């Protein structure tokens, strides 16, 4: 069996060799396909081979888009070869990181302007509060109410003092009544009997004692600080009035209303002033104050 197989294999190899030799002789007998007189074609450029070599892993992006981590097929950057440089893409603008400002140090122009405005308001409020004596309010609403009340009192005081230059008592009375209505009942001494006076218009003993203490207090405050004196008079429901004006008003109201007002005045010595005035009581709605008169000469 082995000899038979060996002989069969040898015959098959010989037949193949004969077929190969016949094929080679047939090909050599064929005429050439090109003209040998023509020059050989130029070799391909080396850049093409270089680009193909660099772009060899490019098809892998289509087979494994998730593993490559590159851009999608629809984007221009994904279709662009990796070995070339893009000349049409816009420059990437990097956003500046936002820095959070520390407390009290704003960086926004609007915030800075608002902070400066609040600081100016606080400074003006402090200066305005210093003009009003004996202020003890801390919140802005209460402080503004107190300042408004004090300014109204000063306006009333100025109007009353300006009446000393008026001529007749007949014209002073209606003006003073108008001031009483404007001040909300602060100057009601001419429209209601004063507490502490008897039926004859004379002051009682307790009224005289309170009169003296009030006069001394007002005179001392006027020597130290005029603003504090005004604040004290405002709290007591009093208002400074020249003696001549009080006398004229008293005479006018005595003849017209039957002696409803009887001013009481006393002189208080002061070295630095020659002003003579009387403090006329203005009873409040809550409690009626005694008729107090004070003068500063």
Curated annotation (Swiss-Prot):
Triggers of expression: Repressed by heat treatment.
Keyword Aminoacyl-tRNA synthetase annotated: no
Region (Disordered): 59-109
Residue ranges with Polar residues bias: 73-90
GO MF entries: DNA-binding transcription factor activity; protein dimerization activity; transcription cis-regulatory region binding
Annotated region (Helix-loop-helix motif), positions in chain: 119-154
Location within or outside the cell: Nucleus
Gene Ontology terms describing biological process: regulation of DNA-templated transcription; root hair cell development
Matching InterPro entries: bHLH_dom, HLH_DNA-bd_sf, IND-like
UniProt subunit comment: Homodimer.
Function: Transcription factor that regulates the development of root hairs. Does not seem to be involved in the regulation of sperm cell development.
Record-linked PANTHER family: TRANSCRIPTION FACTOR BHLH83-RELATED (PTHR16223), TRANSCRIPTION FACTOR LRL3 (PTHR16223:SF376)
Protein name stated in the entry: Transcription factor LRL3
Lineage: Eukaryota, Viridiplantae, Streptophyta, Embryophyta, Tracheophyta
């Amino acid at each position: 069996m082995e000899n038979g197989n060996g002989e069969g294999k040898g015959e098959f190899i010989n037949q193949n060799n004969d077929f190969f030799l016949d094929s080679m002789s047939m090909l050599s007998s064929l005429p050439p396909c090109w003209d040998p007189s023509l020059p050989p074609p130029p070799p391909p450029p080396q850049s093409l081979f270089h680009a193909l070599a660099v772009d060899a892993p490019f098809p892998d992006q289509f087979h494994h888009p998730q593993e490559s981590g590159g851009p999608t097929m629809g984007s221009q950057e994904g279709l662009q070869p990796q070995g070339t440089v893009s000349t049409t893409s816009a420059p990437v603008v990097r956003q500046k990181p936002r820095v959070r400002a520390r407390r009290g140090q704003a960086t926004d122009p609007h915030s800075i302007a608002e902070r400066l405005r609040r600081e100016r308001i606080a400074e003006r409020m402090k200066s305005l509060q210093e003009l009003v004596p004996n202020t003890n309010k801390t919140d802005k609403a209460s402080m503004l109410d107190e300042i408004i009340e004090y300014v109204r009192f000063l306006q009333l005081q100025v109007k009353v003092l300006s009446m000393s230059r008026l001529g007749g008592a007949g014209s002073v009375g209606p003006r003073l009544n108008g001031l009483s209505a404007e001040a909300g009942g602060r100057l009601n001494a001419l429209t209601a009997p004063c507490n502490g006076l008897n039926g004859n218009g004379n002051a009682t003993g307790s009224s005289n004692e309170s009169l003296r203490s009030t006069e001394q207090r007002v005179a001392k405050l006027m020597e130290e600080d005029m603003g504090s004196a005004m604040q004290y008079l405002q709290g007591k429901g009093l208002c400074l009035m020249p003696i001549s004006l009080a006398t004229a008003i008293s005479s006018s109201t005595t003849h017209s209303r039957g002696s409803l007002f009887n001013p009481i005045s006393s002189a208080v010595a002061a070295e630095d002033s020659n002003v003579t005035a009387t403090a006329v009581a203005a009873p409040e709605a809550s409690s009626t104050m005694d008729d107090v008169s004070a003068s500063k000469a």
